[in-house]
Amino acid sequence: MKILLAIALMLSTVMWVSTQQPQGVHTYCGRHLARTLANLCWEAGVDKRSDAQYVSYGSAWLMPYSEGRGKRGIVDECCLRPCSVDVLLSYC
């Protein structure tokens, strides 16, 4: 009986630990993601990229290779999975 209780306690502890997120890593979705990103970029002194930056390249096929990260990837990295502030800042 004591062995079953010890096994149950050990399994519940393992399950609880596996569901915990590391410190500094959170999930950001929707408005919370947009506001957090806007605040972080503003505090870092980074302005939002404008379309004028892409026009200077002259070729539409170069747009995906411009500096910075793509806009679609942030949802994959920070909404579907937890991400850190450093990952968010890389999208500024």
Curated annotation (Swiss-Prot):
PROSITE patterns: INSULIN (PS00262). It comes from the Eukaryota. GO terms for cellular component: extracellular space. The keyword Signal applies. Brain peptide responsible for activation of prothoracic glands to produce ecdysone in insects. Heterodimer of a B chain and an A chain linked by two disulfide bonds. This is Bombyxin A-3. It comes from Bombyx mori (Silk moth).
